[in-house]
Amino acid sequence: MARIAGVDLPRNKRVVVALTYIYGIGEPTAKKICKDAGISEDIRTNDLTPEDQEKLRSEVDKYRVEGDLRREVSLNIKRLVEIGSYRGIRHRRGLPVRGQNTKNNARTRKGSKRK
């Protein structure tokens, strides 16, 4: 089992799909990583050689993923709340941040309706 960026990649999946298990890497980024590392997208994770795994690790290290990315996102939200911007206020109140209507919808964000 390949371990990259602190994440155990699933064994029997294609490398492109397995890389998407890492927070911050989607399918387009995974394809770019495979291309830059010179690894076929169709190869399975359990068929990777140790050299291939090392190539993938070095390519993934060029991106901000997992803990660093989570920390950056949370700090960005914290900054918005501290400066009192509209988006920060919406985060603080637990309401939708990106302009969605809240008259009837947004139950996931607002919580259950009290009777």
Curated annotation (Swiss-Prot):
Biased composition (Basic residues): 106-115
Coiled coil: none
Key word Ribosomal protein present: yes
Gene Ontology terms: cellular component: cytosol; small ribosomal subunit
Region feature Disordered, mapped onto this chain: 92-115
Keyword terms of this UniProt record: Ribonucleoprotein, Ribosomal protein, RNA-binding, rRNA-binding, tRNA-binding
Record-annotated disulphide pairs: none
A GO molecular-function descriptor: tRNA binding
Keyword rRNA-binding: yes
Entries under InterPro entries matching the protein: Rbsml_uS13_C, Ribosomal_uS13, Ribosomal_uS13-like_H2TH, Ribosomal_uS13_bac-type, Ribosomal_uS13_CS
Subunit and interaction comment: Part of the 30S ribosomal subunit. Forms a loose heterodimer with protein S19. Forms two bridges to the 50S subunit in the 70S ribosome.
Biological role: Located at the top of the head of the 30S subunit, it contacts several helices of the 16S rRNA. In the 70S ribosome it contacts the 23S rRNA (bridge B1a) and protein L5 of the 50S subunit (bridge B1b), connecting the 2 subunits; these bridges are implicated in subunit movement. Contacts the tRNAs in the A and P-sites.
Family listed: Belongs to the universal ribosomal protein uS13 family.
UniProt protein name: Small ribosomal subunit protein uS13
Organism: Lactobacillus gasseri (strain ATCC 33323 / DSM 20243 / BCRC 14619 / CIP 102991 / JCM 1131 / KCTC 3163 / NCIMB 11718 / NCTC 13722 / AM63)
Organism ancestry: Bacteria, Bacillati, Bacillota, Bacilli, Lactobacillales
